């Protein structure tokens, strides 16, 4: 089921047939270089996909979605909205991970912008964040490009991160 569409991308629900594509993404060391847990095995990828297929028990409207390159209908990544608890508060992250052959084309920004708009307009969220490993300057740039600003450094169960955030802008009506 299609969730979002941009000029060059389609974001849709993940399906079991996405497993091999997701594994190709998750098993690539360069693509996963900023994830503290590193690459994932096929079984770990399968478990993560099953978790996303089942939906978050408290936030079923959130999750990661297959990211398809519209021109070729090729699976090029996974993006979406993820719930986190930070400092005792529930936050929603704009998350994005694209196949490295699609980097440096503005696709991360295009996906993140559409996801943020969806979060604000369709889900009526008032705040969105990005959690970024401090050396991941490409993700920092994506967050800044969609209007997020640096808020703080932090550490969670996965490791150290930079927290960027943005708030829903009041309607001009």
Model-derived features: positions:
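Acyl-donor (CoA/ACP) binding surface of acyl/acetyltransferases
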Residues: 1-33, 50, 62-173
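A short gly/proline-enriched turn/hairpin at secondary-structure junctions
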Residues: 32-40
């Amino acid at each position: 089921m299609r969730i979002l569409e941009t000029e060059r991308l389609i974001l849709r629900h993940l399906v079991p047939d996405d497993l091999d594509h997701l594994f190709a993404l998750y098993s690539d060391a360069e693509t996963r270089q900023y994830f503290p847990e590193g690459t994932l095995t096929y079984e770990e990828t399968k478990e993560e996909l099953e978790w996303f297929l089942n939906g978050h028990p408290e936030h079923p409207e959130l999750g990661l979605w297959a990211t398809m390159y519209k021109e070729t209908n090729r699976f090029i990544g996974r993006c979406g909205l993820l719930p986190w608890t930070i400092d005792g508060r529930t936050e929603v992250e704009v998350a994005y991970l694209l196949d490295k052959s699609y980097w440096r084309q503005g696709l991360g920004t295009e996906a993140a912008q559409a996801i943020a708009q969806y979060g604000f307009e369709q889900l009526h969220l008032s705040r969105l964040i990005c959690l970024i490993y401090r050396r991941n300057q490409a993700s920092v740039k994506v967050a800044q490009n969609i209007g997020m600003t640096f808020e703080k450094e932090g550490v969670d169960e996965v490791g150290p991160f930079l927290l960027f955030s943005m708030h829903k802008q009041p309607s001009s009506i």
